[in-house]
Amino acid sequence: MHDAALIIGLVGVLIFAAHLFEAIFRHTRIPDVLPLVVIGILLGPLLGIATPTSFGAVGPIFTVVTFVLILFEAGTGLSISSLRKTYQETLILTTVTFILNVALIGVAAHYLTGLGWVRSFILASVVGGISSAIIAPMLGQLNMQEDGKAVLLLESSITDVFCVIAALSFIDISDFGDITQFDIGLAMGKMIASFLLAAMMGTVGAFGWSYIFNKVRGLQNSMFTTAAIVFVIFGIAEWLGYSGAIAALAFGITLGNISSLRLPKLYSGFNTDFSGLNISEKAFFAELVFILKTFFFVYIGISLQLANWWLIVVGLILTALIFIIRLPVVKFTVLKSTPVTDASMLAIVIPRGLAAAVLASIPFQQGMEGGDIIQNVAYAIILISIIITSLLVFLVDKTRFSRFYAWFFPNLGKQSKAVD
């Protein structure tokens, strides 16, 4: 009974702490993700008060539920006009970044860890992309224009798929033992299908749901029915082998812009008046995501495993390489009209997170030689990238460090106005 009382009390403290960290952010510009992850590390790896096994099967399910709602809620805040303006830029930035990350991190990991080439590229693929689960809840706190936020959110969602397909493909190569037996065309086909069909499912699902939404609103306690539909679409997409994350994001984007989207009437008796989220519903989901992300980031901190100090140093070196790679990629791929502040954020807001943590555990669980090294280095990169991202956001926003990026991006647009 005392343990239950302690846990309930801790839940209340964490919620109050999350609001405090958000208030601190408004003054310091340090994202609240950092102190929440640090709390998790204190409770988990350092003090041993909690471990991922303490949550049993609930922990992984909770992370997926939170991840889905975070993507959906972030999608509702994106405008179609911003997506139209930034999708080409996003695809170029995402693809170039991911390819360079996998190539250079793979080579560096091979020489720093002694892993074989294929296993080094497994590690590189695992940490090759930024985390939508970390970035989506940070967007509202970043000093960026809407177009820049759209680029970050889309990139993080796309690279989650890149990481999954690439990492599993290299694991297949490791199983084959011969790269010539690997079908790269099949892997590319899976990737394209995962994007397009998942996006189609999310979009069609949003139109279908919005058509009956007004009728559902008449039911008692119907606020959470939209979230239920998001879970259904995510589950179906994943079950079919597509990207549930892309489906959830597409659902949110479509539902958030439904008032500006019109389908032609199929026949005169068909009413095409679609309904999106109202103000109270948006506020409900924003508050729900705020509470869930609080426990989500603490859980990530608890889940991190930092057992070998040399591998932590390797993680630090590889994380530094990730940030170095990002600078020239942003410089040569973003539009010339991009404000310097937006380009700066695109260069520094590149944390690793949920997808990397899940993928890093697969080689170890399969008993692959070097699987423990892959997992430990990946966990170190996740932690260090979150810390560096948070600190750089503060430095760029509050100190003269921003002058470095103004110097590095001399040909880009003028700086955008600060956001409170």
Protein language model annotation of sequence segments:
Residues M1-D420:
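Transmembrane helical cores of multi-pass secondary ion antiporters/exchangers
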